Amino acid sequence: MFKSPGPYSTIHCVCCYIIITIVLLPDQIKTYKTYNYSPLKLGNYIAGITLYQFTDDSPVMLNPGGYFELIFQLEGSFVQSVVHQDSWQIRPDFFVGGLHSRSFMVKPDKAGAKLLSIQFRPNCARFFIPDRLNLFKNKIEDLESVFKTRFLSRFHEGFSQLKMLEVIRKIESFLISVYREKPMSPIDVAVGDIYQKHGFVNIDQLAQKSCLSPSHLRKRFNEEVGMSPKEYSKIVRINHIAGILSRKPEVHLTELTYQLGYFDQAHFINDFKSVTGVSPGRFNQ
């Protein structure tokens, strides 16, 4: 019988409050509608469930959110591309989305396309995905090849006929069937500290707080979270900054540079652009 994580609950509460799912450019806001749902049984592991209904076939730019996703394309098909690259990748109908280090574009094949996103809490995908998570970095992997099962294929056509709560119930039942109990990890402490400090952390201090050597921290963090602590901190940091820019588009970059603790504005701009592909000044244009 499935059990709640018990001792992980405190860590999850530390990590969950900063999750940012998607930041869009202003001209993309009307290309789809979203409907948010709460998990039924897996609230300690799943941060959110979002249904996206696309109103046209325009591409949408998504910024990396720092979490693993399960994606179920319920209607239509989609292609994906890294920002500023011309090649497009066809996405499987059901897939595991690993951590992304750069923004990417998603394009539906038609108006009316739908997809469901299951977003894991930070450091919680490891309870369900049967492999080292760094193997999924910047990748989308067919769900059946990851879990070695055809369980979900039997429901593919039926998903569109079901009410959304029944779809969620079936997906959660599948996740419960592949759940693996794991001991508490010092990486939970590191992830919590990264979110608490909005990604502005020193890796050596992070290792010390986690009672690990820097090299051991990097190895375990890669395997349990999906990328290095330095890369992950950057994603959390840029999401924090993107949130500020979205809420306060009138903010002066010079003032923000020093409020955030950057050495100079050039460093700030390069840090932001390395993830989003645009400078902070152009982010809201």
List PLM regions with ranges.
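Positively charged N-terminal leader segments that act as targeting/secretion signals
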Residues: 5-7
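Long, low-complexity intrinsically disordered regions
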Residues: 218-223, 230-233
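Alpha-helical bundle regulatory/interaction domains
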Residues: 2, 12-198, 202-204, 210-214, ...
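Short, basic, alpha-helical segments at the C-terminal edge of helix-turn-helix-like DNA-binding modules
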Residues: 233-242, 282-285
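A secondary-structure capping/hinge motif
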Residues: 223-227, 271-281
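Hydrophobic side chains within alpha-helical segments
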Residues: 72, 237-240, 267, 274
